[in-house]
Amino acid sequence: MFEHDFLALFPEIFLINATIILLIYGVVFSTSKKYDYPPLVRNVGWLGLLSVLITILLVAVGSPLAVANLVYNNLIIDNFTYFCQIFLLLSTASTMVMCLDYFKQESLNAFESIVLILLSTCSMLFMISAYDLIAMYLAIELQSLCFYVIAASKRDSEFSTEAGLKYFILGAFSSGILLFGCSMIYGFTGVTNFEELAKIFTGYEITLFGAQSSGIFMGILFIAVGFLFKITAVPFHMWAPDVYEGSPTIVTAFFSIAPKISILANMLRVFIYSFYDPTWQQLFFFCSIASMILGALAAMAQNKVKRLLAYSSIGHVGYLLIGFSCGTIEGIQSLLIGIFIYVLMTVNVFAIVLALRQNRFKYIADLGALAKTNPILAITLSITMFSYAGIPPLAGFCSKFYLFFAALGCGAYLLALIGVVTSVISCFYYIRFVKIMYFDTPKTWVLYKPMDREKSLLLAITVFFITFFFLYPSPLFLVTHQMALCLCL
């Protein structure tokens, strides 16, 4: 039994060992005058990227032919876990590519940030495969501890320290709520395993009346609140704009991409597989509407790029929760397609922001001369913004179309209507980027330095997928359908 567990968990074990070796490497060479910053940080970045790519290969080689329960039923490997882990590792690899030159540009001697990004990726891999409330909570806490530190990693910046402190205080509060919910579920049912919980709740109507039912209801409500805080859904979004703005840009990019995949995957496992009940649909229905409306309206007033992207992220979480609210196979499939396309667009836009950071690009108005000084980058950013806005035939339109179609299929007409209206409103601030780049006369001309080769390659790949996704969406459809079936059958 132990041998099978070891083989199945070999990718995670490899990544943990690689992270520890990288930490030792960084500590040893940080005292050397020849190999210290800046070569050290870049070397750690490249080795970290290599570790992630090898982990992707190990996960791909060990593709599951059947469902496997590991470590006394605390973890599970199935098609849903497999594809989510590969997708998470690809998004982490994208972040590592973006950070190769970032620390040199910002004069940050912080190889520890790369090590912590890898460690949080390990925790997210375990989070995706968690099959027990205790295993899930431990994985979420390991991820959160890494995030608290990297949010405040720019030690000479008051904004970064403030961001880390805010995230720590509010994150600790949400983790406490999540743990309290898990303890209530255990107290009223006597089990923590997802499979056992699914058997208990099959055909069991949860209401506020009756001591046992109300206790279970409150427990699941607390778990839902803890999750919604982690994915920045309204009304638990308060921390996101300040933390996104104050954190180093590469950390903001990582916060926008990786946790969304792991937390949403975990939410699907918990609520669709174990606790599925129409009661939770109403909660996510409300959060979806609130997130879409606030994300669309609050972003209109923003002048800073990172703050606007934070509200954009909140709005997109609202769109993804449409699929969650449906509770159907089509809804889950549309949510998974939505996550994939959202991550592609977010990687793209942050790669551009990081490329322009060489000149301390901070405000949207700073884009004034981009169409004339770097027309290719301006076209790339325009395509991404049109995709964010949901302009056909780009990938962003396909994502929203499938989500709204799933909402109509399950009778959630109000959800689809509000989604369409907020999409139209969001066009204003996305297309404002294009207007500033092409039609505004800049007060001061900024000559942007050429982008490094790694980011150029990353941008080329993401823009290609965003632009031509509509021509051949079948592979993603097949993969997401398999993942949805794993949860529903």
UniProtKB/Swiss-Prot annotation:
For this protein, the record's HAMAP family field holds:
NDH1_NuoN_1
Q: What's any one GO cellular component for it?
A: mitochondrial inner membrane
Which Pfam family, any one, appears in the UniProt record? Proton_antipo_M
Upper classification of the source organism reads: Eukaryota, Viridiplantae, Streptophyta, Embryophyta, Marchantiophyta
Q: Which family does it belong to?
A: Belongs to the complex I subunit 2 family.
Membrane-topology annotation of the record: Multi-pass membrane protein
Entry's Gene Ontology BP terms: ATP synthesis coupled electron transport
Question: Which InterPro entries does this entry report, sorted A to Z?
Answer: NADH-Q_OxRdtase_suN/2, ND/Mrp_TM
| Enzyme Commission number(s) of this protein | 7.1.1.2
Q: Which residues cross the membrane?
A: 9-29, 47-67, 80-100, 114-134, 168-188, 216-236, 248-268, 280-300, 309-329, 335-355, 376-396, 401-421, 459-479
Write out the entry's keywords from A to Z.
Electron transport, Membrane, Mitochondrion, Mitochondrion inner membrane, NAD, Respiratory chain, Translocase, Transmembrane, Transmembrane helix, Transport, Ubiquinone
Q: What's its catalytic activity?
A: a ubiquinone + NADH + 5 H(+)(in) = a ubiquinol + NAD(+) + 4 H(+)(out)
MF terms from GO for this chain are: NADH dehydrogenase (ubiquinone) activity
What protein does this entry describe? NADH-ubiquinone oxidoreductase chain 2
Function according to Swiss-Prot or TrEMBL: Core subunit of the mitochondrial membrane respiratory chain NADH dehydrogenase (Complex I) that is believed to belong to the minimal assembly required for catalysis. Complex I functions in the transfer of electrons from NADH to the respiratory chain. The immediate electron acceptor for the enzyme is believed to be ubiquinone.
What PANTHER family would the database entry show? NADH DEHYDROGENASE
Enzyme type, top EC level: translocase
Q: Which gene encodes it?
A: ND2
